[in-house]
């Protein structure tokens, strides 16, 4: 009888501990909030969908929340104050309202959060009737978009700054599959901190569209906000790359002011 009582007591205590643990997890506050500005219904839809699916899993793993928008109308100083990370998921640097431009500039120049940009975020020039956003061009290194590899190509990326937190756990070289590599009217290198470049001789299939020295991952250290741009991000196939997913994960945590995990 005494043994049975002890058994019931221990079982009861175990259940209480389980309920307390579940309750704690249910009420656990997210560690940060991210805003994801997406380009939808275009040639990058597959990449965007794959990225959002990956973000759902990663946000649960790292306990953060994110909101998705596909236009800039709602962006203001007050709106951005709710987000510690701004992810520009292929949304181009045009079709922004004057209010959203001003709010974004303050967000970046005052260091109010961190920024991660992909691919189309460097489509700088006059497109769809919109003028080039000069501030964004300077932010990206004073560049103007020039050309791209229409057929897409797999290529080797070389890490230049292996000590950058976004490169934590990455090899010095790795392959990025099936992407659309951009060229610009000038090299951004003199005006930005280059983190990685692409080896144009490694393009498969080969292409004559080249820059020579070709940065593809960089940061603008003149901004108070932590920021990083990835030129890759055209096709969903990139999410077959463990290295790309590792960089994306590292970038989110770093932009949020946290240490990337191994």
Q: Which ranges hold each PLM region?
A:
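Bacterial Sec-dependent N-terminal signal peptides
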Residues: 1-29
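Extracellular/periplasmic catalytic domains that process cell-envelope and extracellular macromolecules
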Residues: 28-30, 60, 78-82, 97, ...
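Extracellular ligand-binding/catalytic regions of CAZymes and related secreted enzymes
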Residues: 27-32, 38, 60-64, 201-216, ...
